[in-house]
Amino acid sequence: MDITLSSEHELILKTVKRFMEEEIYPHEEEVDQLGEVPIELGKQIEARAIEAGLYSANLPEFVGGGGQDYTAMAIMEREYGKTSHALHSWIGRPTELLMACQADQVERYLLPCVRGEKRELFALTEPEAGSDVMGMKTTAQRDGDDWILNGSKHFISGPCMPDFAIVVAATGVDETPRGPRKRV
């Protein structure tokens, strides 16, 4: 398959490569030795990614994201993948699930994440169910204004200093013509 990059995609590739050379690669040895990204360094990387227009590139322009297409995101992810996930996770790609925010959730979660003011983590995968939502065991029950979560998650995405968590959990069971289905 021959994929010819547009001039815009070539510019994105050049921008990401320069960013990686200036902001990421110089810190690889330090991070490898420490076994983690120091918070100050992570926040510095995040701020530079925002300045470079790389932060939230995956989200639409109408919410303040970069509005990049799948080819651009593949180019970016390929370059990011040349370093440790611990480092490149600070460049920032808020989960597209935030686009499901409604009403006050937009101001509380979506827009601050797009601007880099908040970070989310995403917890779906479970030890026995993997990412099979219908096979998961984690439940959530309403308790006044709160939710009580019961269950286990692993392989959590975005755990670098999160401000909030998106946790996939069953909130009940509905009867359907095909049998009981978990309400998620």
Task: Give, region by region, the residue ranges found by the protein language model.
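C-terminal helix-coil-helix/basic helical segment that borders enzyme active sites and/or dimer interfaces
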Residues: E28-E36
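Short, contiguous pre-domain boundary segments
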Residues: M1-T4
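A structural signal for short hydrophobic beta-strand segments in well-ordered beta-sheet cores
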Residues: T138-Q141
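A short, Trp-centered hydrophobic/proline-enriched beta-strand micro-motif
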Residues: G116-L124, V168
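Internal helix-loop-helix
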Residues: E46, I50-E117, S157-F164
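N-terminal glycine-rich anion-binding loops that anchor highly charged ligand groups
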Residues: T15-I24, A49-E51
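A short core secondary-structure module
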Residues: N150-V184
